[in-house]
Amino acid sequence: MGLTYKDSGVDKEKGYEEVQIIKEIVKKTHGKEVLTGIGGFAGLFKPELTDMKEPVLVSGTDGVGTKIKLAMELDKHDTVGIDLVAMCVNDVLCQGAKPLFFLDYIATGSLKPAKMADLVRGVAEGCSQSECALIGGETAEMPGLYKENDYDLAGFAVGIVDRDKIIDGSGIKEGDVAISLSSSGVHSNGFSLVRAALDMANVKLSDKFEDTTVGERLLVPTRIYEKEISALLKEVEIKGIAHITGGGLYENVPRMLPENIGIEFDIKESEIDSVFKAIQKWGNVETKEMFSTFNMGIGMVVVVDAKDVDKSLEILQKIDPKAKQCGVCKKTETSVKINLK
């Protein structure tokens, strides 16, 4: 008998099994706009455009980085899919867009249907939180490129916004106010530094951390800010939005600012999430490096006119009680200044 694809490490039967398992999971994210099910060559989506004068599609793509390694070590795979959606959708939200649909890509050394189902279940949960549809994806089994139990994730989000409502930060001026939306923890960036800090302090993922374990605390999925931004857009003019990912406030806030405008942040050290204080202690990491790597408890920064601050906080705090004014826009060549109190 001749060589088969299965002999070379690719099991098509497991691929078929995975498709059957995930079909119902994916279907739960579909509304009437989705015209196709799983298994076709492409996903079809018919957006509702009647309320838009000049609709513009907004796209974003990202991954989860080395947080996946943590999921592998804990053998817990049902939350990194939420991270994947969050990393893409939160970027799309920064332009004022409403998320429409999402696609995922999973690459692995050996297809494990139950594990893949957990991953897709997380993606579907992220899509539900984002109010967007999971309309397609790809699972690639690549023995020789990945170890048997290794995998990687990539995602692609598409949203829509009316052209005259695109948020690009160009109208931000001196005196405007920055509002912070709280993060759920480390989110999906800086995990290479986290792992190095754990190794330096000989801290194990199974060690106790407050009311949970170190591993479980670090694995908490990235917050998705669709509800906050959607609610605010209905009532207030948002001038700029920054998703605080790798590089922290220092690298992400400038991406929404016009020239010669910066934000001076006032942050209380007592309000910084304990997980960041622990990482800093484990790795003896300098404070500037912490703020240059992690979100430090701020997952998104929204800029509004000073007259809209109270109304904005009233809206946002119904969803995120920790939302607060965190800074003021000033004329300066320094994009970000952090006052730690």
Swiss-Prot record:
Q: Name one GO molecular function term.
A: phosphoribosylformylglycinamidine cyclo-ligase activity
Recorded hits in CDD domains, A to Z, give: PurM (cd02196)
Catalytic activity line of the entry: 2-formamido-N(1)-(5-O-phospho-beta-D-ribosyl)acetamidine + ATP = 5-amino-1-(5-phospho-beta-D-ribosyl)imidazole + ADP + phosphate + H(+)
Q: Which GO terms describe its cellular component?
A: cytosol
What InterPro entries does the annotation carry?
PurM-like_C_dom, PurM-like_C_sf, PurM-like_N, PurM-like_N_sf, PurM_cligase
Known pathway: Purine metabolism; IMP biosynthesis via de novo pathway; 5-amino-1-(5-phospho-D-ribosyl)imidazole from N(2)-formyl-N(1)-(5-phospho-D-ribosyl)glycinamide: step 2/2
Coiled coil residues, start to end: none
Q: What is its main location?
A: cytoplasm
Q: Identify the keywords attached in UniProt to this record, alphabetized.
A: ATP-binding, Cytoplasm, Ligase, Nucleotide-binding, Purine biosynthesis
Cite a single GO BP annotation: adenine biosynthetic process
Q: What is its EC number?
A: 6.3.3.1
Q: Which SUPFAM superfamilies match?
A: PurM C-terminal domain-like, PurM N-terminal domain-like
Question: What broad class of enzyme is this?
Answer: ligase
This protein's source sits in the domain of life called Bacteria
One Pfam family assigned to this protein is AIRS
Q: Where in the cell is it found?
A: Cytoplasm
- NCBIfam families (UniProt xref): purM
Q: Which family does it belong to?
A: Belongs to the AIR synthase family.
Stated name of the protein: Phosphoribosylformylglycinamidine cyclo-ligase
Supply the source organism for this entry. Finegoldia magna (strain ATCC 29328 / DSM 20472 / WAL 2508) (Peptostreptococcus magnus)
Gene behind this protein: purM
